[in-house]
C-alpha cells in the first residue's frame, strides 16, 4: 500500500488496485511475480492524489502467493473485495472511485479476476490494461468467456497500453464504454514506461484525472 504524499486523515482519495505480471526473466526485465514490483499505479499519479495498492494472486488453502498463474481465482477475487473495503474504512479510499490496473498476467486479471462475479465487478470505476487482456487465451481467459465477463463491467472507461485495438475489439464492444489505446514505444515486455514522462504515460495520467475527477499534479 502506498499513501500519497498529500494524504490527510479524514479526506477521500481515488484508489488504484494493481495486479503484477508472472515471474519471468528476459534481458530487459526480471519480473518477480510479486506485488511489490508493481509500478503502474505510481506512473498514473506520480505519488500524489490517490491511494495505490498492489495485490497478490493467492491460494488460501495452500497459504501461498502465486508468482505464476492465478492461485485460487475465487480467493484472489474475495481478497480484492476485502482490501477495497479496508482501504475505505481505514485510509479514506473512495469506494466510488476505484481503478483496476495490471501488467501482463495482471492485465488479464482485470477481466478474469476483476469481473469474475457481480460483487467484485461492482467495485470498478475504470480499467487500465498493459500488454495483455482478458480474452487472449491464457490460463482459461478465452475470448468467449471474456466477452461474458465484460458484460458485468459497470465502470465508465477503459485504457490500454501496448494492446492491439483489433484483437481486443470483441471485449471492447461488450463493455460498451469509451476506450483509449496508446502505444508506449518501449519495445519490451515491462512496465518501465510508467517511470518516465513519455507521451503514453502522460496520456494515462490525464485519463486517470478525467475518470476520477482529480486534480492535475
Regions found by a protein language model. Give the residues of each.
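Short glycine-enriched nucleophile-adjacent loop
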Residues: 107-119
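Soluble non-cytosolic domains of exported or imported proteins
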Residues: 10-13, 70-78, 104, 118, ...
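Extracellular/periplasmic catalytic domains that process cell-envelope and extracellular macromolecules
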Residues: 8-12, 43-48, 93, 119-122, ...
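The feature captures the conserved acid-bearing segment of alpha/beta-hydrolase catalytic domains
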Residues: 119-208
Amino acid at each position: 500500500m502506498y499513501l500519497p504524499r498529500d494524504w490527510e486523515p479524514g479526506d477521500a482519495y481515488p484508489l488504484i488496485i494493481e495486479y503484477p505480471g508472472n515471474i519471468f526473466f528476459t534481458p530487459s526485465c526480471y519480473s518477480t511475480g510479486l506485488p511489490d514490483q508493481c509500478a503502474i499505479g505510481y506512473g498514473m499519479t506520480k505519488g500524489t492524489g490517490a491511494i495505490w495498492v498492489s495485490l497478490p494472486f493467492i491460494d488460501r488453502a495452500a497459504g501461498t502467493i502465486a508468482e505464476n498463474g492465478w492461485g485460487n481465482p475465487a480467493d484472489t477475487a474475495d481478497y480484492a473485495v476485502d482490501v477495497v473495503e479496508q482501504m475505505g474504512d481505514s485510509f479514506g479510499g473512495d469506494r466510488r472511485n476505484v481503478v483496476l490496473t495490471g501488467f501482463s498476467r495482471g492485465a488479464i486479471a482485470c477481466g478474469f479476476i476483476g469481473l469474475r462475479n457481480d460483487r467484485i465487478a461492482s467495485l470498478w470505476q475504470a480499467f487500465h490494461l498493459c500488454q495483455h487482456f482478458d480474452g487472449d487465451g491464457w490460463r482459461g481467459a478465452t475470448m468467449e468467456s471474456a466477452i461474458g465477463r465484460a458484460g458485468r463491467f459497470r465502470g465508465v472507461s477503459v485504457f490500454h497500453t501496448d494492446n492491439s485495438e483489433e484483437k481486443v475489439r470483441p471485449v471492447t464492444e461488450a463493455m460498451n464504454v469509451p476506450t483509449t489505446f496508446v502505444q508506449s514505444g518501449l519495445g519490451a515486455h515491462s512496465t518501465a514506461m510508467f517511470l518516465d514522462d513519455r507521451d503514453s504515460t502522460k496520456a494515462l495520467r490525464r485519463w486517470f484525472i478525467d475518470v476520477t475527477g482529480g486534480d492535475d499534479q
